Amino acid sequence: MSIDQSTAAKVAKLARIKVEEDALPALAEEFNTILGFIEQLNEVDVEGVEPMTSVTPQRLKRREDVVTDGNQQDKVLANAPDAREGFFAVPKVVE
C-alpha cells in the first residue's frame, strides 16, 4: 500500500493538523515508511506464541468480587467544602 500526497493531506485534515503544501511529500513518505514497517510486522510468524500483556509474567491476587461502601465516607467527605447527611452538597445550578 502506498500513500500519495492527496491521501496524506486528507489524513492531516482528518487529524486536524495543518500541513503546508510543500511539506506534503515528506509527510507522505513518512506514512509510507510507517506502513512498510507494519508490513514487516505482518510477515513475522507468531504461530504457537501465546498473546501477552507484558514481557514479564504477572499474577494478580484474586479476591471475591463483593460490593462494599469502602468504609471511607468520613475521609472522603472531610475533603468536601460542604457535606450534609453523608453526601456532597453543591449549589443549585438548574432553575
UniProtKB/Swiss-Prot annotation:
<dbReference type="GO" id="GO:0050567">
    <property type="term" value="F:glutaminyl-tRNA synthase (glutamine-hydrolyzing) activity"/>
</dbReference>
<keyword id="KW-0067">ATP-binding</keyword>
<comment type="subunit">
    <text>Heterotrimer of A, B and C subunits.</text>
</comment>
<dbReference type="GO" id="GO:0006450">
    <property type="term" value="P:regulation of translational fidelity"/>
</dbReference>
<dbReference type="Pfam" id="PF02686">
    <property type="entry name" value="GatC"/>
</dbReference>
<comment type="similarity">
    <text>Belongs to the GatC family.</text>
</comment>
<keyword id="KW-0547">Nucleotide-binding</keyword>
<dbReference type="GO" id="GO:0005524">
    <property type="term" value="F:ATP binding"/>
</dbReference>
<dbReference type="InterPro" id="IPR003837">
    <property type="entry name" value="GatC"/>
</dbReference>
<protein>
    <recommendedName>
        <fullName>Aspartyl/glutamyl-tRNA(Asn/Gln) amidotransferase subunit C</fullName>
        <ecNumber>6.3.5.-</ecNumber>
    </recommendedName>
</protein>
<dbReference type="GO" id="GO:0006412">
    <property type="term" value="P:translation"/>
</dbReference>
<comment type="function">
    <text>Allows the formation of correctly charged Asn-tRNA(Asn) or Gln-tRNA(Gln) through the transamidation of misacylated Asp-tRNA(Asn) or Glu-tRNA(Gln) in organisms which lack either or both of asparaginyl-tRNA or glutaminyl-tRNA synthetases. The reaction takes place in the presence of glutamine and ATP through an activated phospho-Asp-tRNA(Asn) or phospho-Glu-tRNA(Gln).</text>
</comment>
<dbReference type="GO" id="GO:0070681">
    <property type="term" value="P:glutaminyl-tRNAGln biosynthesis via transamidation"/>
</dbReference>
<dbReference type="GO" id="GO:0050566">
    <property type="term" value="F:asparaginyl-tRNA synthase (glutamine-hydrolyzing) activity"/>
</dbReference>
<dbReference type="InterPro" id="IPR036113">
    <property type="entry name" value="Asp/Glu-ADT_sf_sub_c"/>
</dbReference>
<keyword id="KW-0648">Protein biosynthesis</keyword>
<keyword id="KW-0436">Ligase</keyword>
